[in-house]
């Protein structure tokens, strides 16, 4: 066990510091904004320092582990720890949350509560990624939902209450299945119940029971990821939420579902995952085509970007279902890659809305001349989203392709069919993304409007855009930076399978 409680401090610090903000004197919104940004930067620096000096990349076991008895009545411990699977998502959470707080500068209504909720969400997300106890994982999972619901219902578009209600119904409903899975898997088998993930990873179950556990967890994570047909909350939520909230949703919250699939479904229930993986492969392939086909029909800019997130999630599902070293590595890389790309696209969509106050693409046009910086960044990041070589998305999708090709689980004809359908999806992706850019930035619609004028990106927005773009290009050029973190853990997970 680690001598110093690094992870406890990293998890508790944001929400504790955010609580202090409620007692700060009322001296305008700027105090709250800069206080929150300072907390996020300090948290990110603390996390980076703790990981740099205490994390060994060649060790697949849990590191920085903490294990404290919490409730004596039953076997409930405050168990924290990280490995190659969680370190990338925790660093991504810190980076995106810091930039999202900077993006939230235009928010003036109830600024104190808004920034407190962002910090509370920060704690819940890091807690989920670093939990080594199933019940603690569930608590952190639920803790993170409350701030998201309030952020959706209080700040956003005209239909924000509808989208927030839809979000909470979907996620709270899926949490019932998560709780059933947690209680079932912890109470089965041994003489006394255990919630320790490390012990549960070595537990074996009757086939029928393992399938039931797998389905319960799969439903919970499929809603959050999202996986079709449980995705319908996502376009509505993204369409109405404030763009800083969208950055957190696309950049981090969706990744929690994918993380759960690997951490629990794949690691704890390998036999059931092996049985379900062909079906997940089919769903992932359909998802890529479905989202890429549906996206061009969306008038709302943020809804169109939301469907691109659904399409990218298809590659993650396929990578997880391939049960191969390249496939799983590609899925993990895609989780990190899309965290940056999704957050960046929603930020640029939000900054565009701040200027023109239009959400429908068919009402836009001709913006490129007046806002060349936003136009340039939007074009570059659209290229990143459609997996242009040299960008992180290209490497991630390419490795997933290798994962399918090298998989021993599927017949050759199945692999050819899957790759063919995925290729069609990759052809459709540039169509809806480039069409989106054309509708926004080309033509003469806004230029012909009387008194048409608005300003381009300021220093804050330019800094934010470049800050997200740099890791996208960096990972695209040198993907080993991310892959080296998880490679040993991936091998450890796949050692439970008979092929790959």
Swiss-Prot record:
UniProt xrefs under InterPro entries: NADH_Q_OxRdtase_chain4, NADH_Q_OxRdtase_chainM/4, NADH_UbQ_OxRdtase, ND/Mrp_TM
Lipoprotein as UniProt keyword: no
Transmembrane segments: 4-24, 35-55, 87-107, 113-130, 134-154, 167-187, 211-231, 242-262, 272-292, 305-325, 330-350, 386-406, 416-436, 462-482
Lineage: superkingdom: Eukaryota
Catalytic reaction list: a plastoquinone + NADH + (n+1) H(+)(in) = a plastoquinol + NAD(+) + n H(+)(out); a plastoquinone + NADPH + (n+1) H(+)(in) = a plastoquinol + NADP(+) + n H(+)(out)
Taxonomic source organism: Olimarabidopsis pumila (Dwarf rocket)
Manganese is among the record's keywords: no
UniProt protein name: NAD(P)H-quinone oxidoreductase chain 4, chloroplastic
GO biological process: ATP synthesis coupled electron transport; electron transport coupled proton transport
Enzyme class: translocase
Topological category with respect to the lipid bilayer: Multi-pass membrane protein
GO cellular component: chloroplast thylakoid membrane
EC number(s) stated in the UniProt entry for this protein: 7.1.1.-
Keywords: Chloroplast, Membrane, NAD, NADP, Plastid, Plastoquinone, Quinone, Thylakoid, Translocase, Transmembrane, Transmembrane helix
């Amino acid at each position: 066990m680690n001598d110093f409680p690094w992870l406890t401090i990293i998890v508790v610090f944001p929400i504790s510091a955010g609580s202090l903000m409620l007692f700060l004197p009322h001296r305008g919104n700027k105090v709250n904004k800069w206080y929150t940004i300072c907390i996020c930067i300090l948290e990110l620096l603390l996390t980076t320092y703790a990981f740099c000096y205490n994390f060994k990349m060649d060790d697949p076991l849990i590191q920085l582990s903490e294990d404290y008895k919490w409730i004596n009545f039953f076997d409930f411990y405050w168990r924290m720890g990280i490995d190659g699977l969680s370190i990338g998502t925790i660093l991504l959470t810190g980076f995106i949350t810091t930039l999202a707080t900077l993006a939230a500068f235009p928010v003036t209504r109830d600024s104190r509560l808004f920034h407190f909720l962002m910090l509370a969400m920060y704690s819940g997300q890091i807690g989920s990624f670093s939990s080594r106890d199933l019940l603690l994982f569930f608590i952190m999972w639920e803790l993170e939902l409350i701030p998201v619901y309030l952020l959706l219902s209080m700040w956003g578009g005209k239909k924000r209450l509808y989208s927030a209600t839809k979000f909470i119904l979907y996620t709270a409903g899926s949490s019932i299945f998560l709780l059933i899975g947690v209680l079932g898997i912890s109470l089965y088998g041994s003489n006394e119940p255990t919630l320790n993930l490390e012990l549960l990873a070595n537990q074996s179950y009757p086939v029928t029971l393992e399938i039931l556990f797998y389905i319960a967890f799969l439903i919970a994570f499929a809603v959050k990821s999202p996986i079709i047909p449980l995705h319908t909350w996502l376009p509505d939520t993204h369409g109405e939420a404030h763009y800083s909230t969208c950055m957190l949703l696309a950049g981090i919250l969706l990744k929690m579902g994918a993380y759960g699939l690997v951490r629990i479904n794949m690691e704890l229930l390998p036999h059931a995952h092996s049985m379900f993986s062909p079906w997940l492969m089919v769903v992932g392939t359909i998802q890529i085509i479905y989202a890429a086909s549906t996206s061009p029909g969306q008038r709302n800019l943020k809804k169109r970007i939301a469907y691109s997130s659904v399409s990218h999630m298809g590659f993650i599902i396929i990578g997880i279902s391939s049960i191969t070293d390249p496939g799983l590595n590609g899925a993990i890389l895609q989780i990190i890659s899309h965290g940056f790309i999704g957050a960046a696209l929603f930020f640029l969509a939000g900054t565009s809305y701040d200027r023109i106050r239009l959400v429908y693409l068919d009402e836009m046009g001709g913006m490129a001349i007046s806002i060349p910086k936003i136009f340039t960044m939007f074009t570059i990041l659209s290229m990143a989203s459609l997996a242009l070589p040299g960008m992180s998305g290209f490497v991630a999708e390419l490795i997933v392709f290798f994962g399918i090709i090298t998989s021993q689980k599927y017949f050759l004809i199945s692999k050819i069919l899957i790759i063919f359908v995925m290729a069609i999806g990759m052809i459709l992706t540039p169509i809806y993304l480039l069409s989106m850019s054309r509708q926004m930035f080309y033509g003469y619609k806004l230029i012909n409007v009387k008194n048409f004028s608005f300003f381009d990106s300021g220093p804050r927005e330019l800094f934010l855009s470049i800050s997200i773009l740099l890791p996208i290009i960096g990972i695209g050029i040198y993907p080993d930076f991310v892959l080296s973190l998880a490679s040993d853990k991936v091998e450890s997970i796949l050692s439970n399978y008979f092929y790959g």
